């Protein structure tokens, strides 16, 4: 009897194929009856349906591709992600309002906007985080500073005001530079300090420096200010520098006077400043300003000052319910309420300035500085300055400038749509960015169909028709223009409220390049 051959390699246990139930749809019982819900993972749709208009703006203005090409990100591995995929992922996540690297996962399935930016895919959070670590810090800062300057430099031909201030970013881990310092929101909690320089009124970021949490005074902000001014041509310097009471030191003011730039700061209420308030409290000659404020101009020389300087005492009458000092005041605490002859009371502040403008103008200039806090509130809470944290300080410095750059790009783009006012991101994103976009292709033509649930959809459609008409006119003459001249044309349209019919003229290209 011939036996069957032995099996050298047993087949093992037989596999039992289980029938997998394919769920075609789910049923949800709603107040409007039952509905059938299906998923379509391969559909070419996006929740940022109106982003295509912003991408056109970046392309016509020559903002995105030069920024990508000049990025000092270098990989040696053949499996490393493409540079444009990394930077494009950052732009998409920042525009969407994300605040953590992990949030990039939310847009990894966006197969519509990524190709529009020239990308092949959206990278993961680890690739994005490691990319910033791979950029040499000094090279990365110089790269971002250059493109930040290019985003706003045409506007510096107009008279402008430089606001300098510091904001605190509270930290909850063990990051480099996370030290305990001045932190009014979370006392005793470690933080980083963001030393920021802004263009007043138009709310654009000139530069931002991230430092340790215990370096919040103007002594650490001023060196960056002077370095920034050194990079700006002298003819484009601000009309004056504006800062809070931390800037009213002799060191800062002497440096400003030596450089020939005017300033407007607030003074701390030192004993001599309090004495000055007592001295002029009952004097006549106070000038009425806006909204119940009064001002008196004089001179003051503090002990630490090398020379006397012009100061403006500002006061406002308090209501009767605020006229008395609080009963729970600390011992030796100075009360700002001084009794007047008519038994009313005032609150005081003292400004120091090198400007020779009228008192009313100076007071209004400093009151306008309150918009600086609105800028901080927007970019911290509606963009990403409160997030994107890493263990090392260098990536934090790079991402802070990257967020400022995308913020500038978006703010100027929104001005193209609505030139009369600044829309914060909490308003502009739902209005001009969000919307379901479905991409279809037929006969070689790609169509993006947008569905917006915003109540002002008709306004947005009309606004984008105007923007597209402007870009069509610009593209018609673009072959005759340089990238710099195209950007000047775009900013002239975006800032027409401030230009009042004028057009920004680019510099002589030969001298500009040299």
Regions found by a protein language model. Give the residues of each.
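Anion-binding and metal-coordination hotspots
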Residues: 1-50, 55, 64-514
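Plant-biased, long, compositionally biased intrinsically disordered regulatory regions enriched
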Residues: 57-59
